[in-house]
Amino acid sequence: MKAHAGVEMQASVEPHRNEPSASGHAVRLKTLVIGLGNPLVRDDSVGLRVVQCLAPALAGREDVDVAEDYWGGLRLMERMIGYDRAIVVDAICTGAPPGTVHVLSSDALPTQRSASAHDVNLPTALAFGRQAGAHLPPDERIRLVAVEAADVLTFSEECTPAVAAAIPRAARIVTELLQTLPGDASP
């Protein structure tokens, strides 16, 4: 795989394609569902909690991988290598009422989950990865399911009540996106 400015990227995994399986049915595209957050910061943990809620229901699906991470930007882009679609679940602060669930396209992704000023936002990271030759989902196959946070500063392992109440709704939205996000070639 090409590298840029001394950054080595992991080789891409060959993903599932829209090719007939042995049974003649189209194979679903490989999808990453990844929750972002800090498990020790109140509402910042909501992305992790949503994917933890989803993991048992998605465990039997060979076309979906469920993951957790604490970083956005370049690290998130690297986690997407080899996938055809991605759903990122995270907290967001836009001023909407706490617990509001937003669905954003990749060009609107504000995520900058980085403790370093040396990282970039996800759209920039995706552009970098594609330029370096990484197999990444196209923008139209990436969504952010973002839960409006009330408190992203307090150390606590519990979300605020409004955000905790939004977890099942966010999980349902992720499940719906798995069925409707472009590229689903299931029979």
Place the predicted regions along the sequence by residue:
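Intrinsically disordered, low-complexity terminal tails and inter-domain linkers enriched
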Residues: M1-R28
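Helix-loop-strand module that forms the ligand-binding subsite of alpha/beta enzymes
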Residues: A91-I142
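Short, contiguous clusters of charged residues that form electrostatic/catalytic patches at enzyme active sites
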Residues: L48, Q52, L74, V120-A127, ...
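Residue-level signal for pocket-adjacent positions within structured domains
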Residues: G35-L36, A96-G99, A115, V147, ...
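Nucleotide and nucleotide-moiety/phosphate-recognizing core
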Residues: V27-I34, P39-L109
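Generic structural signal for well-ordered, non-membrane alpha-helical segments
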Residues: P39, D43, G47, H118, ...
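Phosphate-binding/catalytic loops
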Residues: A125-P187
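Conserved short-loop catalytic and cofactor-binding motifs
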Residues: E14, N38, V64, R113, ...
